[in-house]
Curated annotation (Swiss-Prot):
HAMAP family linked: UPF0344
Record keyword Cell membrane present: yes
Protein known as: UPF0344 protein BcerKBAB4_1054
Keywords: Cell membrane, Membrane, Transmembrane, Transmembrane helix
UniProt KW Ligase keyword: no
Length: 122
């Protein structure tokens, strides 16, 4: 399940940047944007399944940290969607980019620090 979640995130980020480049070039990015929305569903479902598998075995404060990671992941998805919607309507996106980047850094840090991660920050 971890590999499916990571693959969904990688595809989601690729589709996000493709849709962003299409919108910023003035072309229609609706098809890519809709594909990205399907990836959001896969990301959320696989993330929730991972969270539920951890709840069964985690002890101590691990529930809290994985819950924080899940909330930050939802913020990343919300930030991605808000950036693309504002780009499609030709509105400023500075604050939304800030939300997206802060949430993405938090998710990456927690994902690499927590036990299911790669132990980069040990």
């Amino acid at each position: 399940m971890v590999h499916m979640h990571i693959t969904a995130w990688a595809l989601g980020l690729i589709l996000f940047f493709v849709a962003y480049s299409l919108y910023s070039a003035g072309r229609k990015g609706k098809g890519v944007h809709m594909g990205l929305r399907l990836m959001y569903i896969i990301i959320i479902v696989t993330g929730f399944m991972l969270y539920m598998s951890i709840v069964k075995t985690a002890t101590g404060s691990m529930h809290m940290w994985y819950g924080m990671k899940m909330l930050a992941g939802i913020l990343v998805i919300a930030g991605m969607e808000m950036v693309l919607v504002k780009m499609s309507k030709n509105k400023p996106t500075g604050a939304v980019w800030g939300l997206f980047i802060v949430a993405l850094v938090a998710v990456l840090y927690l994902g690499l620090k927590l036990p299911l991660g790669w132990y980069v920050f040990k």
